[in-house]
Regions:
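Ubiquitin-like/PB1-type beta-grasp interaction modules and other compact soluble beta-rich domains
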Residues: 1-81
């Protein structure tokens, strides 16, 4: 699975992307976030309030409850704002 990070999320994590293999216990975006938060405190800080984060699965706007698979591309980014 490829995971992409944008904007302040990328800045806080210090990386724009990473690759990982999913185990069978990871079925949703929420499950993935729980796993990532166990990696280190930077993930815990980024994902403590997911109301300020949007997610896409394979470039489709998605929800945190949506199913994910090992070959998916997941992207985390802040909500779009206009000006």
């Amino acid at each position: 699975m490829k995971i992409l990070y944008f904007s302040w999320i990328k800045d806080k994590l210090g990386k724009s992307h990473e690759e990982m293999q999913l185990n069978e216990n990871i079925k949703t975006v929420n499950d993935l976030i729980t796993l990532l938060k166990k990696n280190n405190e930077n993930y815990e800080d980024v994902f403590k309030d997911t109301s300020s984060i949007k997610v896409s699965i394979n470039m489709e706007t998605s929800r945190f409850e949506d199913s994910i698979h090992d070959k998916d591309e997941i992207a985390f980014f802040p909500p779009m704002t206009g000006g």
